[in-house]
Amino acid sequence: MTDKIRTVQGKVISDKMDKSFVVAIERTVKHPIYGKFIRRTTKLHVHDEHNEAKLGDVVEVRGCRPLSKTKSHTLVRVVEKAQA
């Protein structure tokens, strides 16, 4: 049985924790009455074993078992490094 694990891309907005960072994931949703598309943001706490991701990087993350009270995602790869 092969299940495709869902991965999402987002931007690192905080990397002050050791082996963790916060990523913001933007999505667009349609307003139920007016029909206008609105940007919504979700913040996720992500586990980063080797402290690879830095502030401003675009990263790919996937869900995993709960690692702490707020952390239940892990880093897959850094898609794009932030401008220095």
Swiss-Prot record:
A GO-annotated cellular component: cytosolic small ribosomal subunit
Keyword Membrane: no
GO biological process, one term: translation
One Pfam short name: Ribosomal_S17
Gene Ontology MF terms in the entry: rRNA binding; structural constituent of ribosome
UniProtKB keywords: Ribonucleoprotein, Ribosomal protein, RNA-binding, rRNA-binding
Matching InterPro entries: NA-bd_OB-fold, Ribosomal_uS17, Ribosomal_uS17_bact/chlr
Membership in a protein family: Belongs to the universal ribosomal protein uS17 family.
Complex and partners: Part of the 30S ribosomal subunit.
Listed NCBIfam families: PRK05610.1, uS17_bact
Role played: One of the primary rRNA binding proteins, it binds specifically to the 5'-end of 16S ribosomal RNA.
PANTHER family tied to this protein: 40S RIBOSOMAL PROTEIN S11 FAMILY MEMBER, SMALL RIBOSOMAL SUBUNIT PROTEIN US17M
Protein name from the UniProt record: Small ribosomal subunit protein uS17
Upper classification of the organism: Bacteria, Pseudomonadati, Pseudomonadota, Gammaproteobacteria, Pasteurellales
